Swiss-Prot record:
Residues covered by the SWIRM domain: 88-189
Compositional bias per record (Low complexity), positions renumbered to this chain: 56-71
Originating species: Oryza sativa subsp. indica
Organism domain of life: Eukaryota
Basic residues: bias regions: 44-55
GO biological process: chromatin organization; spermine catabolic process; thermospermine catabolic process
Name of this protein: Lysine-specific histone demethylase 1 homolog 3
Function: Probable histone demethylase.
Biased composition (Pro residues): 1-10
GO molecular function, a single term: flavin adenine dinucleotide binding
Region (Disordered): 1-79, 790-811
Amino acid sequence: MSDQPPPYTPLPLLSSFPPNPYPDQTPDPASTPTLVLPNPAFPNKRKRTGFRRKLPSGSPAAPVAVAASPSAQPPPRASAADDIIVINREPTAEAVTALTAGFPADSLTDEEIEAGVVSDVGGIEQVNYILIRNHLLTRWRETFNSWLAKESFATLIPPHCDHLLNAAYSFLVSHGHINFGVAPAIKERIPKEPTRHNTVIVVGAGLAGLAAARQLVAFGFKVVVLEGRKRCGGRVYTKKMEGGGRSAAGDLGGSVLTGTFGNPLGIVAKQLGLPMHKIRDKCPLYRPDGSPVDPEVDKKVEGTFNKLLDKSSLLRASMGDVAMDVSLGAALETLRQTDGDLSTDQEMNLFNWHLANLEYANAGLLSKLSLAFWDQDDPYDMGGDHCFLPGGNGRLVQALAENVPIVYERTVHTIRNGGDGVQVVVNGGQVYEGDMALCTVPLGVLKNGGVKFVPELPQRKLDSIKRLGFGLLNKVAMLFPHVFWSTDLDTFGHLTEDPSHRGEFFLFYSYATVAGGPLLMALVAGEAAHNFETTPPTDAVSSVLKILRGIYEPQGIEVPDPLQSVCTRWGTDSFSLGSYSHVAVGASGDDYDILAESVGDGRLFFAGEATTRRYPATMHGAFISGLREAANITLHANARAAKSKVEKGPSTNTQACAALLMDLFRQPDLEFGSFSVIFGGQASDPKSPAILKVELGGPRKKGATEGGKADQHHSNKLLFQQLQSHFNQQQQLYVYTLLSRQQAMELREVRGGDEMRLHYLCEKLGVKLVGRKGLGPGADAVIASIKAERNSSRTKTRPSKLKIGIPKSKS
């Protein structure tokens, strides 16, 4: 079966910044440009397997030009838009690159706002910053084997924007968006010895732990990685199989690079010179007796399946919050009974195969998946092909682990965090001590209480650990004397008659083109994956061979016994206790964010696929979470250094103070509406300083300008005056101001909601709201004094002081 390509939707270039001062000028609609971008609503969970990707019903099969609204206006002949800098003639293409890297094309991320990359959120400075940021991202993607030096842009960026270049470059490097990976030019920048006094203990050498450790070493930290297994990689495990003079490498864990657009693991693969094999769309299905499925019946049932998924989306929209307490499985079964149009056994078997595929995509039973949020990560799909990596994903793991200090067979059972550091206790009682720790153990281990935290984790984090689901996928890998299956396909499927066994060997992966030998992999999903945990390996292999012989022997093809076979048991593996996470009934995407939160005043951090709301249950999600936490650890370390300096004099470290400010506002002294306040000085002094934070949500201001007075400015203005965020989501912005305690209390008493408070703040009090950097150095001392006061108030209740350092490991 062949599949249609993912839909592409041309978006009109809608207005953003700045507003148009000439609202009565109307452009010629025929000349209105459009931007063709991948449709983010493409059903990710239906294609995560890397094959049989289908359009949802009613989706366009080809791009359709969409003109901008007639109300869109051309730009003024002279306006603030003329201050937009010109870097090149391809800002639209660079915006698309930013989108694939996880950035909004025309706005800032929360992390950028918190880092204070611009002093005026929403102005021309932000527009120019985004142009520079997108250009840096694009250049990095083009030159990933080289170190991207800031100096190479000195002649390209106007002098008045040097500070924006510095801010963008610093942010992208520190957050792992550029200059990461394993290219020689990147590795030679890693310091031979630590340049910082901070010690970080990383628990777990999976992709998250390796990504974080590698970054932290590059940033100059002292790092040690504690791994319970005898190998690195965690749930990414490439097994070398041998027998009869044959050998092959099979991925028993994470196996598919899901999407190549912007995937950082794709960058690492390219740095290693590894070709990526696109998983071909052809996926024939076979009935329980081994005969091929009728193509027309297959087409009909697949259409019914997609129709019911679409109807389930409409159903949850109509149910509102009630959908949080309903499973996807219950919704699909109800819809099938009322509108399923499945009349024969073959049609029901085919439908159950699609359900098994859906359970594979989520590593969870449909009866456990949340109807409301099971696909909450779909808008962030990387896009692009799904691929196998020749030789297995273990090649990525080995490259990332190179020169990273890893101590194997160290099973962590206790993590303590105190006022001055952390202690990590491993099997045998050995204690590792450091300044900070990063926990990357799988959600299954956290659910089972495999690691004890002292003090106990906050209740909100414990609740999220309990709410999120952690499912199971198992495999049977078989090395044969020769390839007897078709060489023009990478996948084929098999139907079962018993619905409770629908996930049993329902899908086969052919690794013959990428493993170096005749390797075939049978997948076990859903309820069958749990039953498989106790199935004797010989019985499992016999069942697989029976299926294969039922398919191929009627065609006159002999199926030999395998030379070697391996059965996985991820559910009972004590270091994983499952495969990957999903949003269970009662949970939401918020729970991923909560799992990612640090605890212990920035001493204990968390990473892993179950800590990323956008990319859960993926290898690249785990990798990205490690880069994220390396950045967070660095920010907190800088904040502590800044605090130490502030006690002697005000700090000029902007990012460090930004991190301090972010921490302080986690527990504001005063909250009302979208406003929160932290107080400094004496409570009895009405003139004592305070810092106000305002959360601005909802749609951004929309100007109506378009076009340009010069060709070289044309695309820049169109992009940043008209392009809406690709994800079409409302962005929350945070702005700040310094004021007195008395003014803050007056503001709280203003009636009429946030709009009236904003009016009072700006018009009556004459206060200007700015980004973090706009607060200026005067705020740094206030921030530091508030932090010092809070630390002082906690002194009596803090755990005892811990020694810093890493003991010599016992061999």
